[in-house]
């Protein structure tokens, strides 16, 4: 199973998510749980479409780090 890093951002009305390694792979949801489900589905569909078009599937390369600042 391949794991891609996902960035989730909260806005006043919903959550947005995007995948740094998959250009254009984005999703939204009203709750954190909903956006997680939606981005997982978006990744699956994105990869299927890339395969159908004969595109190279990128290996995950983005890394996540939490940086503390004063």
List each model region and its residues.
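A short, exposed loop/beta-hairpin motif centered on an aromatic-Gly-Thr core
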Residues: 23-32
């Amino acid at each position: 199973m391949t794991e891609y890093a996902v960035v989730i951002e909260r806005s006043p009305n919903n959550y947005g998510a995007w995948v740094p390694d998959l250009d254009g792979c984005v999703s939204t949801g009203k709750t954190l749980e909903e956006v997680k489900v939606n981005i997982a589905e978006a990744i699956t569909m994105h990869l299927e479409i890339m395969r159908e078009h004969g595109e190279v599937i990128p290996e995950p390369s983005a890394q996540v780090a939490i940086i503390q600042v004063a």
